[in-house]
Amino acid sequence: MPPSNSTFDTCFHIHMVSDSTGETLMEVMRASVAQFEGTTPLEHLYALVRSSKQLDRVLDEVEAYPGVIMYTIVNADLRRELETRCVELGVPAIAILDPMLATLSAYLGRPVASRAGAQRSLDADYYRRIDALNYAMAHDDGQGDDFEGADIVLLGVSRTSKTPTSVYLAHRGFRAANIPLVKDVPIPEAVFSLRNPLVVGLTASPERIVQIRRNRLLSLNEDRDTNYIDDFAVREEILFAKRLYAKHKWPTIDVTRRSIEETAAKIINLLMEKRNMTV
């Protein structure tokens, strides 16, 4: 039974069943639920469900806590079993990849790939993201020196979201290094001769940077009488960075009013454009 309308937040159970890690399901579910104000999903994630026995345990949980089921299961027999049981339980089931797969199949004139190939692809994607995350951690804040192995190299003065953006890009499978820009301190010479990676300069408004830096110093209980948060000094830092970006024709992104996700999306678009130009 669907939840009733109320002046309070509507809580409901949502079950995500995947034969892989379930990350795709989680992202789609949260993006979808965000479109409905006043709702709070009670999330149940079941990953690596690849047998009837595993599915039985999932459905026992669904029976105990009825709600919407979202799934990405490619095994035809397991799908039929899940769909049949959902009808019996009277709960809606959504195969989130079906519309995309059906459209691609019709457009390409080819059937959907077999189980094993699809799973290998999913596994490869998982390990690619793990590798990217390890790379981001080893090349955070100017560490490391093998920048040619990166997909993306981010530059920026302190507090321009370099590290969180690098980590988010890593979760998307892109190897990202980030290098801090400090006025009158040279950056690694290797950056100027990079051929494979996309080099991107991050910037933000002086007011935004000063605000973030002040909050950081306050949280660390450190001295706030410093050039680190001096308006004029910060403006000089930003100007130095912008001149560097312009000199080397590196694309620049102002992160002042962008979320990490929006910044990363812009960077990925720039990377795809660069790769398309070199094909």
Swiss-Prot record:
KW Kinase (keyword) present: yes
Residues annotated to bind ADP: G156, V157, S158, R159, T160, S161, K162, T163
Reaction equation(s) it catalyzes: N(tele)-phospho-L-histidyl/L-threonyl-[pyruvate, phosphate dikinase] + ADP = N(tele)-phospho-L-histidyl/O-phospho-L-threonyl-[pyruvate, phosphate dikinase] + AMP + H(+); N(tele)-phospho-L-histidyl/O-phospho-L-threonyl-[pyruvate, phosphate dikinase] + phosphate + H(+) = N(tele)-phospho-L-histidyl/L-threonyl-[pyruvate, phosphate dikinase] + diphosphate
E.C. designation(s): 2.7.11.32, 2.7.4.27
Presence of the UniProt keyword Transferase in the record: yes
Alphabetical UniProt keywords: Kinase, Nucleotide-binding, Serine/threonine-protein kinase, Transferase
GO terms for MF: ADP binding; ATP binding; phosphotransferase activity, phosphate group as acceptor; protein serine/threonine kinase activity
Entry-linked InterPro entries: Kinase-pyrophosphorylase, P-loop_NTPase, PPDK_reg
Family matches, as NCBIfam families: PRK05339.1
Function, in words: Bifunctional serine/threonine kinase and phosphorylase involved in the regulation of the pyruvate, phosphate dikinase (PPDK) by catalyzing its phosphorylation/dephosphorylation.
HAMAP family: PDRP
Similarity remark: Belongs to the pyruvate, phosphate/water dikinase regulatory protein family. PDRP subfamily.
Protein name in UniProt: Putative pyruvate, phosphate dikinase regulatory protein
